[in-house]
Amino acid sequence: ASQSSLGIQINTAESNSDADFNPNVESMVSDGCNLIIGVGFNLEKAVHTSADENKDVHYALIDSSFNDGNNNTVTLDNARPLLFNTAEAAYLAGYVAAGMTKTGKVATFGGIQIPSVTVFMDGFADGVAAYNKAKGTNVQLLGWDKASQNGSFTQSFDDQTLGKEQAQQFISQGADIIMPVAGPVGLGAAAAAKADGNTWIIGVDSDWYEANPDYSS
């Protein structure tokens, strides 16, 4: 709509691997784009570097803040993070999970321990805790301790085998509802849940019921 009503030219580039991040961002600079939007935390370094080198270009980064390389958030004059309070949705998921579990154990795990992942896990933990307080129950959360910020991570957003293995571990410990926060790795967890037959998966980032019908029920 903005292309026709405002006369804005829009360029797009899709990254097929990490090696594409920098060239894709720089191609936008070369094409004369004055607002460049990176989608996803993986593009943080490429967008950050380009913003430092091109002060007359504006940048935005979806789903991640900018950092100094040591996980300390930094502010850039010509770039802004676009972050969403996903803890709120995860809180509701945690509350419902605590109310639905038949074993008294639910679980969550992440891909990599970064803020855009742990914010989901924090919200889920708060939801479980709120249900326990409201209902006088003692539902246990596996995979994440909000207070210590310690938990389970696959160190990958791609390897579905790792998601399956992590879910199987939780299932063996008694969890019957699992919320993976690990992109496609979560589909491995869904496969484990389907194979078990008594475990439910909570999807993030999209409507998994529609996006992954093989695991809908």
Where are these regions (language model features)?
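A residue-level marker of the well-folded mature domains of exported/periplasmic proteins
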Residues: 1-217
